Amino acid sequence: MATTFNFELFKKRLNLFLEKIEDLGGATEPLTIEKPATEEEVKAVEAQLGYTLPPHFREGLLENTAHLEFWWDINDITDEDEDFLPEELAEIFCGELLFGLDLLLGYEESRKSWVEDVYPDYNNKYDRVWHNKMSFQQVGNGDYIAIELEPENYGKVVYLSHDGSENHGLYIADNFKEFLMNYAAVGCTGGEDWQWEPFYTKGKGIDPTSENALAWYKLLNINEKELDI
């Protein structure tokens, strides 16, 4: 799903969702976007990882931000009104995007621990998904969102499940920048897979033009033109 990266539009989408969630009575945290990383800072982390970061991720750190935090929660709304969410969106309760150069080594240490302790067999189809990835976001339930390092699908964004989800190994964007744009366009719902799954379209990944995405916008009083989809 070809998507043009526009950092200003990306930030606009994040702020719009925070505004709409607040209007409905949900909880939010201020959007945190730190200054870009330096080439020296990136190379220092790459030296410890033993490889060059995937290009879209690397460019994002150098050109846009070295650390970003975005979060909202609607549990208070759904506790008060159990029918607030339609059935197809009923699993949604929060949104989060949290990545940073400063977090990368810790995330990778944790992912590698899963590989060593639980999923060591590269010849096992499920285990193999955990291998040769670069995790950039740790999901609250223990899963990860990562970037593929295997040559065949290098650079794609992939979901890593620790507990047998059918979405384990699912590619949700062709690259990191596409992921940012499309994930922001649905409010970074998740990151647990069952929260963003309603917006997944086979062959497109997270799809802000999907029927469920349009229903989500309507629920939050968002005009899709505001998102410039």
Q: What do the predicted segments below correspond to?
A:
Residues 23, 27, 142, 189-193:
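Intrinsically disordered or highly flexible coil/loop and linker segments, enriched in small
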Residues 138, 149, 162:
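Active-site donor-binding loop signature of nucleotide-sugar glycosyltransferases
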Residues 143-150:
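Broad, structure-driven detector of short, well-ordered beta-strand segments within folded domains
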Residues 155-160:
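Short aromatic-glycine-(Arg/Gly/Cys) micro-motifs in beta-strand/loop hairpins
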